[in-house]
Amino acid sequence: MNQAGVVNAGYPGDTTRELLARFDRDVAPHSPDLVILWAGVNDMLYCGHTVPPEEFRRNFRRLVHRCRIPGSAVAAGTLPPRINAYFFEQFPGAALDPVPPDERVECANAILRELSTELDFPLIDFEGLVRSRPVAEDPASLLRNFSNSGMRDGLHLTPEGCRLAAELAFEVIRREHLPSSRIVCFGDSLTYGPWLKGRGTAAEDAEPYPARLAALLRKAAAR
């Protein structure tokens, strides 16, 4: 945990199954007062490893309860869209799936909204943030694409996207009066930040959203 009390506990490829399996190793030892959960993209889209929607619901509910056992507050992020053309390039077999990727992601977001109401935790609207810019092949997109990064990615955030995601998370923490002295950002590659400077960390000069959030918290504490 860094000076601002933020841990980047993201890991690429994880579904909610893996998050449950590594909770005691990667979250519990930090005794966080807040856990930010951002997961579900791999559950819905990682071909060969997808998790059925109702299992995703059960797993996410278990994650929330697991966070709360020692008294941690919980917030969760909605899932951003992805650039479908890139997705079908990476997973050609997905084009045969009768359920389009956008519908799978929206299914997960609907479950997250329902759980937010049922279990009373705030949502961070990362989906809305990404949709506020062009989603497809555009330099202004918050998703990494060939125009803005030279990579046909279409899922992970640009450095600018991470900065704005951190600002959004910070706003929710302040608005909801959430504790913020010890935060674990727990999720998959969207939290980890592949291809970014300081990936997998919340170091002072790193680019993933947990690092940007830590910087905002340090700035607020210094006022």
Predicted feature descriptions by range:
Residues N8:
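Conserved SAM-binding motif I beta-strand of class I
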Residues K197-T201:
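Acidic/polar, solvent-exposed loop segments in beta-strand-rich repeat domains
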